[in-house]
Amino acid sequence: MRICNLGSLNIDRVYGVEHFVSAQETVLATKYERFLGGKGLNQSIALARSGGTVFHAGAIGPDGMSLRQLLEENGVDTRYLKDTHTASGHAIIQVNASGQNCIIVSRGANAEILPEDIDRILSDFGQADLLLLQNEISNVDYAIQAAKARGMSVAFNAAPVTPELHTYPIDLVDYLIVNEVEGLSLLGCLLYTS
């Protein structure tokens, strides 16, 4: 099975803090680190390292060459990456003294995945293949429907929770990946819409 990960690519800025910043508060960071990430990138690398045949489809900006390079260094095929003029996605991550985090994500180029991009990418995949998605990109609902129309299996990581999440055709998803917060939110949406 080939895996097409239509996934996010982010530049992560991680700040260690004693406590999460509150409204109208300024705190000093105890540590700063910069990483290449995004749920999509992380999942593609993990799958490739586990022996999977992984194609990463997504979008990067002019600042995203290091994202492409990291994927390729880890055996991920990047032929479906779209170069845009928009800055690559990025995240600001606070990690408190007990190791919990709060994350703000700017989609950047991740928001430039268009239906025609999805159709072009998926035209190379079929019934024996898996589409992996995260909710950090645009047109997730379209991608789910397009993949199922091609007979593909679909795995969806429902993070982050967004207002449109409850409108997605979750019934078409074969594998749903959630943490506690996302699971509770999704269950709440399903309870209110059924």
Which residues fall in each region the model found?
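Substrate-binding N-lobe of the ribokinase-like
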Residues: R2-I3, A23-H90
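Short beta-strand/loop segments at the ligand-binding rim of alpha/beta enzyme cores
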Residues: A147-A155
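Short, glycine/polar-rich helix-capping loops at beta-to-alpha or helix-loop-helix junctions
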Residues: V161-Y168
